Amino acid sequence: GPFDPRMGVIDIGKICKTCGQKNTECPGHFGHIELAMPIINYQFINILKKILKCVCFRCSKLLVNKNTQIVQNILNKNNKSRFNDICNLCSKIKRCGQDTEDGCGAQQPKKYFKNPGISDLYAEWDKLDFTTDDDLLDTTSKKQLLPTVYLYQLLERITDEDCEVMGFDSHFSRPEWLIHTVLPVPPPSMRPSVKQDNQRMDDDLSH
């Protein structure tokens, strides 16, 4: 629970089950809650749309040829400029393999968009000739909701090399990390509670 002794202790005389220290020495230890389904972080939804424009909807490969001179010139820029320039190049490509030799041939969505007020992402195609091996998608509709499970798996398949080309640091900012799969739980020492009549209650200012 939220007051698991492994997350640290705040009561005098008790010992933390993680570090073995008393309340005066224990710094507290973060826990986490695993979500039943991935959830898109609304703050990063526009960045997610840009990432999806850069990689194949089916095989997750980068849509541009990394060996061309124009891409090599882009790699000399800072990460933010690199990401924007690569996105602009990829948005012109309609089919995976159009600019590379190892593409799967899948038609790419015409656009990605979201409905106002919610964090669900949708994709829309020009015509119904795209294919996918995933049962989560309906290939009989030009416009469809993209399940967050599918999005997470698609982003997870992006190689570290392609992440670097897009301007991401694969050690600290993988694309799939923009989708929540767990929620952090701060230790009790960071969310102090108030005792009243032998009961512990959350502090109104910090809970």
Model segments located where?
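Conserved core architecture of multi-subunit DNA-directed RNA polymerases
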Residues: G1-H207
